[in-house]
């Protein structure tokens, strides 16, 4: 039995959707989708450390990500702590390299990394299938990142995944607009009218 770590570091990779079909909005507010996720080498870095007391703190470098309580890594950490009843706090240090609100899944990847990290800090009491349920509650991209798959076909709310073998490594060029925007607004343009 290996000892429970007091801190660890996880790379939280970006992704691209090689295709994306946004379907009808469901009663829960999420859209059904069909997509092909592909993991990229570009990654944020998440450090998680146990601390005395309770609660989750977040320190971010590299980009502004908004209020800590809205951050998916903080929400994910709280899900694991609440779900296990472990009476310790967590300090998260996030180094952002994935452009914020770019559609590359940075926040979702950070959330998946936090689920894995905090579960490890607690001695891995949450089984994989429950972590996937937590991931699905956080967002449509989070289950893919938690799965560890390099390539996956996803549908439903992103929680249904078919793992595929990785594509051959190839250089690529990804262009992002100079002026940031809200990628979620693009999703509303892709939904077919009722």
Please identify what each model-predicted range represents.
Residues 1-102, 120, 124, 128-129, ...:
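ATP-binding N-lobe of GHMP and related small-molecule kinases
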Residues 3-11, 19-21, 25-32, 124-194:
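ATP-dependent small-molecule kinase catalytic core of the GHMP/sugar-kinase superfamily
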């Amino acid at each position: 039995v290996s000892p429970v770590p007091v801190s660890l570091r996880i790379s939280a990779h970006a992704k691209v959707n090689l295709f994306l079909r946004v379907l009808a909005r469901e009663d829960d507010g999420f859209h059904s989708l069909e997509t092909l996720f592909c993991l990229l080498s570009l990654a944020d870095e998440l450090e998680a450390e146990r601390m005395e007391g309770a609660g989750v703190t977040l320190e971010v470098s590299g980009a502004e990500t908004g209020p800590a309580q809205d951050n998916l890594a903080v929400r994910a950490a709280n899900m694991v702590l609440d779900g296990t009843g472990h009476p310790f706090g967590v300090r998260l240090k996030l180094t952002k390299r994935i452009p914020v609100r770019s559609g590359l899944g940075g926040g979702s990847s950070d959330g998946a990394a936090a689920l894995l990290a905090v579960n490890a800090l607690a001695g891995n009491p949450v089984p994989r299938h429950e972590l996937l349920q937590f991931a699905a509650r956080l967002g449509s991209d989070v289950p893919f990142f938690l799965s560890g798959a390099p390539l996956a076909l996803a549908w439903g709310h992103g929680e249904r995944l078919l793992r595929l073998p990785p594509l051959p490594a190839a250089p690529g060029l990804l262009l992002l607009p100079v002026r940031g925007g809200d990628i979620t607004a693009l999703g509303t343009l892709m939904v077919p009218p009722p």
